[in-house]
UniProtKB/Swiss-Prot annotation:
Top EC group: lyase
Bias type Basic and acidic residues, positions: 501-510
Protein name: 3-isopropylmalate dehydratase
Record-listed E.C. numbers: 4.2.1.33
Length: 779
């Protein structure tokens, strides 16, 4: 059916969503066009394999950009010769080489390890100008929300959806709710966007934004730089949101102008005119509104194993004795035991073993400048075993080196590394040893996130750097800086040939001049007459899933909240290029312990005990099951084990979506109903019967326990009929072609994409001249 946007006031999210609707089904699902697709080595192998098996191609290589980041070592590449000799871990090397083969086979633009532009996907997109305001951006990575800082609708997707976007350049979506978080006033000196977003997550919890797109607004947000805004939106996913967005403004335009893939000339002017309309209208309705006073935010760190375990640095480790909710109390006790902390311990007294500055949250040039200002003229504390600085991209690294930041870090005792995800998730050689405590600028502090039994505390770059110097957590506002009058080199590009490569990491000399804001551009209704696409349609496929009708099986209880995807399947099991063989990895850290010989020994975890070894239904009492990363390996592992349905109060949005793509049925039920009616049966190893056509849950005797559970009509239709999403979408080829014709005309400034990149003669960095300028620490 033809989609007609609301005529009333709309939010920023509404406007971007409306502008990308290709088709709306009668059951309420939407087919959205995707402007930008970022691809990396971990979540793409199975997607490309699916394309090859179905005889399909990548529909829009110009809208696609690939790189390697998760698996690669961050040690020096000075003597890099080949992947075979450089990447020592066999499974990591296989994923990287598989991506290289896939991008060659399908013609996808790619920044490999010998390309100076290689880096973390969420760093290279913005710095190259591939990310643009008002676009839809997806990647097989949950922190794709980063790009929402540009006023784009950006969200993580699973591998099945990666394949869907590669094949159709579209994605099937339900409309999310609107949430606005307004930060009134100005942040106090010493407070960063990392402190602010940790404060927000601590306030609303990791499920606070579930089902919503969060718009960050207010004076404090508008005062942030683009890189600080990216840190905010990066962690919107940790608040449970589908995406985070900030309206584009002059700060956005100035950052974007002149980037290699940004529009030029008349197309730039056309783009800015449109981008200026992308703001929430007066009177637009939000489903949820939260107001925060900026003055209330002070330096914030995490103490436990969830980003919501955030406290002001002036606080102390919480005491479970003060918690009445049994699930929350149990979770707090587990977190304290895992983190090796005692209740009521002052946070500033906690000692640190290692420091990590980097990641897609805080690996940009401003982050490195902030940390360098702290460590200048200082030395690492004697108890610090290792402190690493890992730039977010090769261009960030070169910029930092041109400013002399690498020397500042190295003189203080920090290691200066190559670009990559590094110790953020430990899929590469950078990991913590068991029980080591890390001051980290990354985004997740889950159990085992940075290595088996690792202990992670999240904080800002300045706070992490200060912890490295002091040897324990400190309040950055009390930290004594040294040598602030010293000069630091600042680069001057000396060759026109270098500008195409380097401009992404350098300040721009020509800021955008303010212009009169045009009238809001209305979204055109799609014409009824199909327009022939310039692209050959992808082939339909007969592939599909087994229909899901009724399921009667043993039910297993899981009395936990915030069960993240790192817990469902740890990072070491992600190094595969197949969708199967992941049964052993399911809840690995809970199901197994190493014996004295280093062999896996089963624990008494429920799925290791009869009769639950044969469980097909998992009954969870706590909220937010499957929160965290976009790894589709989580439902793959559940499916491999034999679990076909999960029942929980709520889910992480990406996990919930990924489950349906693999024929699993995640059911949302009120927590008390689960506890009162289902858990008694699950605790006994009894069977439950899930009747999807009638949306009921029964016991083994046929007694109705739940007379109705909710499920979106389109998802139910696909499960009951075993339908393949890609096949369904390709039946709408005429609508996709029609939208692409509209896009070429109305949004012509998006048409260049990654095809504008230069690969044949990427210029090598020539010697640069430097001038010296005082370091400016922008609080």
């Amino acid at each position: 059916m033809v989609y007609t946007p609301s005529k009333g006031p709309r939010t920023l999210y509404d406007k971007v969503f409306d502008a990308h609707v290709v088709h709306q089904d009668e059951n309420g699902s939407f087919l959205l066009y995707i402007d930008r697709h970022l691809v990396h080595e971990v979540t793409s192998p199975q997607a490309f394999e699916g394309l090859e098996n179905a005889g399909r191609k990548v529909r829009r290589v110009d809208c696609t950009l690939a790189t390697v980041d998760h698996n690669i070592p961050t040690e020096s590449r000075k003597n890099f010769k080949s992947l075979d000799t450089f990447i020592k871990q066999t499974d990591s090397r296989l994923q990287v080489k598989t991506l290289e083969n896939n991008v060659k086979q399908f013609g996808v633009p790619y920044f490999g390890m010998s390309d100076a532009r290689q880096g973390i996907v969420h760093t290279i997109g913005p710095e190259e100008g591939f990310t643009l305001p008002g676009t839809t951006v997806v990647c097989g990575d949950s922190h794709t929300s980063t790009h929402g800082a540009f006023g784009s609708l950006a969200f993580g997707i699973g591998t099945s959806e990666v394949e869907h976007v590669l094949a159709t350049q579209t994605i099937i979506q339900a409309k999310s709710k609107n949430m606005r978080i307004t930060v009134n006033g100005k942040l106090s000196p010493g407070i960063t966007s990392k402190d602010l977003i940790l404060y927000i997550i601590g306030l609303i919890g990791t499920a606070g934004g579930t089902g919503c797109v969060i718009e960050f607004a207010g004076e404090a947000i508008e005062a942030l730089s683009m890189e600080a805004r990216m840190s905010m939106c990066n962690m919107a996913i940790e608040a449970g949101a589908r995406a985070g967005m900030i309206k584009p403004d002059e700060t956005t335009f100035q950052y974007t102008k002149g980037r290699p893939l940004a529009p030029k000339g008349a197309e730039w002017e056309k783009a800015v005119a449109y981008w200026k309309t992308l703001k929430t209208d007066e009177g637009a309705k939000f489903d949820h509104e939260i107001n925060i006073e900026a003055v209330d935010v002070i330096p914030t760190i995490t103490w436990g194993t969830s980003p919501q375990d955030a406290l002001p640095i002036t606080g102390s480790v919480p005491d479970p004795k003060n918690v009445t909710d049994p699930i929350k109390k149990s979770g707090m006790e587990r977190a304290l035991a895992y983190m090796g902390l005692e209740p009521n311990t002052p946070l500033k007294s906690i000692k640190v073993d290692k420091v990590f500055i980097g990641s897609c949250t805080n690996g940009r040039i401003e982050d490195l400048r902030s940390a360098a200002a702290v460590v200048r003229g200082q030395k690492l504390a004697s108890n610090i075993k290792l402190a690493m600085v890992v730039p977010g991209s090769g261009l960030v690294k070169k910029q930092a080196e041109a400013e002399g930041l690498d020397k500042i870090f190295q003189e203080a005792g920090f290691e200066w590394r190559e670009a990559g995800c590094s110790i953020c998730l430990g899929m590469n050689p950078d990991i913590l040893d068991a029980y080591e405590r890390c001051a980290s600028t990354s985004n997740r502090n889950f159990e085992g996130r940075q290595g088996a039994l690792s202990r992670t505390h999240l904080m800002s770059p300045a706070m992490a750097a200060a912890a490295g110097i002091a040897g324990h957590f400190v309040d950055i506002r009390e930290f004594e800086y040294k040598d602030q009058d010293q000069s630091s080199p600042k680069v001057e590009v000396t060759s026109e040939d270098e500008k195409e490569l380097e401009s992404a990491a350098y300040d721009h000399a020509e800021p955008v001049q303010p212009e009169d804001a045009p009238q809001d551009i209305a979204n055109d209704e799609l014409k009824d007459i199909p327009v022939k696409s310039d692209d050959t349609p992808a082939k339909p496929s007969s592939s599909g899933m087994k229909p899901f009708l009724t399921l009667e099986g043993i039910s297993a209880p899981l009395d936990k909240a915030n069960v993240d995807t790192d817990a469902i399947i740890p990072k070491q099991f992600l190094k595969t290029i197949k969708r199967t063989g992941l049964k052993k990895g399911l809840f690995y850290e809970w199901r197994f312990r190493k014996d004295d010989q280093g062999k896996d020994q089963e624990t008494d975890f429920v799925l290791n005990v009869e009769p639950w070894r044969e469980a097909e239904i998992l009954v969870v009492t706590g909220d937010n099951f499957g929160c965290g990363s976009s790894r589709e390996h989580a439902p793959w592992a559940l499916k491999d084990f034999g679990i076909k349905s999960i029942i929980a109060p709520s889910y992480g949005d990406i996990f919930y979506n990924n489950s349906f793509k693999n024929g699993l049925l995640p059911i949302r039920l009120d927590q008390q109903i689960i506890i009162d009616k289902l858990i008694p049966i699950a605790n006994k190893g009894g069977k439950l019967c899930v009747d999807l056509p009638n949306q009921k849950i029964l016991d083994s005797d046929g007694n109705v326990l739940v007379d109705h559970f909710e499920i979106e009509p389109f998802r139910k239709h696909c499960l009951v009929n075993g339908l393949d999403d890609i096949g369904i979408t390709l039946q709408k080829e005429e609508y996709i072609s029609r939208y692409e014709a509209l896009r070429r005309e109305k949004y012509s400034f998006l048409e260049g994409g990654s095809k504008l990149l230069k690969f044949d003669n990427v210029p090598k960095r020539k010697a640069v001249t430097t001038t010296f300028d005082k370091v400016h620490q922008d609080w």
